[in-house]
Curated annotation (Swiss-Prot):
The gene is mmdB. Belongs to the GcdB/MmdB/OadB family. The N-terminus is blocked. This is Methylmalonyl-CoA decarboxylase subunit beta. It is an enzyme of class 7 (translocase). Pfam families: OAD_beta. The keyword Transcription does not apply.
Length: 395
């Protein structure tokens, strides 16, 4: 009887608990609290944090790889033949994770984002493209910083640097190509910092701007014709794909989704891309990204370095956008609110909303949201192009 009780205990998760898994489960619970109680981007943090919880449950085997049996036999000619079959299937999340590993989910997310995005503010004010480009500066500064640390190779440093674009799908796509073994920490860092945009950005924005600058009101954007909105995704796809071919996957899917939105003749495809498809992929992507956050993968020096470099990249991207906007404001005949520069990171629409909130704290009658969407959507294109550049250099 005692042996039966011991055998049962050894089969439970309590027997397999260790300090590492307990720490990671506590981290998951903190993320769940932030997502549910504080509403910090719950669409991202709820599936990610639950994935962290699932993967750190002892003996659950959610990310277990399939067990293969290999058999050897001789052919009639005497040659050695090998056959393999699955002796035991892998865990559910292992199979879903192949969408991350093979680079399938990120482009599909971009398809949905394109279907939801109005590029009108960018087309109306092309100068905002510069702010989106400036915000990518953090990617390359952090790339060199990661190499200088001596902890990472060039491929790993490129994958870490892309966190500065504040674009989770792009970070997953690039790291799956250049540093698959670091995809988990990089993806969790990228999505976590995206969710924490309302906390990370405002102190940087207020530190780099005066109250007078934050009160600057922008002139009304011009109306953009339907023809312009249809031509835009086609032209961008052609130009970006010719200049940076590795960026074609992400930019092409982004612009296809946007063409669904703007052409007006494929309403069903637009609706599916921006609702059902992106919601399903967000669930799969979030849970599987979280499931890579095992105690063995996360509780080590390299992971802490990735988290530290990631937030530095994000901060530099935010700051460089604000500083360029201040510089442009000096040269431009029309006033430019420097708060728009921080929206150049590609966390859509969180970064644009932060610009609006910080601006309204200085002047409640100031409405910056639509103006901030210009650099915000430019940042989406910019992060995809940056990923393409890094992939062409180190892929």
């Amino acid at each position: 009887m005692l042996q039966a009780i011991l055998d049962f205990y050894h089969s439970t998760g309590f027997y397999g608990l260790n300090m590492g898994s307990i720490i990671m489960m506590l981290v998951a619970c903190v993320f769940l609290y932030l997502a549910i109680a504080k509403e910090f981007e719950p669409l991202l943090l709820v599936p990610i944090s639950f994935g962290i919880l699932l993967t750190n449950l002892p003996f659950a085997g959610m990310m277990a790889e399939p067990l293969l049996e290999v058999h050897e036999k001789l052919s009639a000619s005497g040659a050695h033949l090998y056959t393999a079959h699955t002796a035991e299937p892998g865990g559910l999340l292992y199979y879903l994770f192949q969408g991350d590993h093979l680079g399938i989910f990120p482009p599909l997310i971009f398809l949905g984002v394109g279907a939801m995005t109005d590029f009108g503010p960018l087309i109306s004010n092309p100068k905002s493209l510069l702010l989106g480009a400036a915000a990518q500066f953090g990617i390359f500064v952090t790339f060199f910083g990661a190499i200088a640390s001596g902890l990472f190779t060039a491929q790993e440093a490129a994958s870490i640097g892309i966190i500065g674009g504040a674009d989770g799908p792009t970070a997953i796509f690039l790291s799956s190509k250049l540093a698959p073994h670091l995809m988990g920490p990089i993806a969790v860092a990228a999505y976590s910092y995206m969710a924490l945009v309302p906390i990370i950005q405002p102190p940087i924005m207020t530190a780099l701007t005066s109250e007078t600058e934050r009160k600057i009101k922008m002139s009304q954007l011009r109306l953009v014709s339907k023809r312009e909105k249809i031509i835009f995704p086609i032209v961008v796809t052609i130009l970006v794909s010719l200049i940076v071919p590795p960026a074609a996957t992400l930019v092409g899917m982004l612009m296809l989704g946007n063409l669904f939105r703007e052409c007006g003749v494929v309403g069903r495809l637009e609706d599916t891309a921006k609702n059902a498809l992106i919601n399903i992929i967000t669930i799969f992507l979030g849970v599987t990204v979280g499931a890579t956050a095992t105690a063995e993968a996360f509780l080590k020096v390299e992971t802490l370095a990735i988290l530290g470099l990631g937030i530095v990249a994000f901060g530099i991207g935010t700051g460089s956008g604000v500083l360029l906007a201040k510089f442009m404001n000096k040269l431009s005949k029309e006033p430019i609110n420097p708060l728009l520069g921080s929206a150049g990171v590609s966390a859509v629409p969180m970064a644009a909303r932060v610009s609006q909130v910080v601006g309204q704290k200085a002047d409640p009658t100031n409405f910056l949201l639509m103006h901030a969407m210009g650099p915000n959507v430019a940042g989406v294109i910019g992060s995809a192009v940056s990923a393409g550049v890094l992939l062409s250099l180190f892929g």
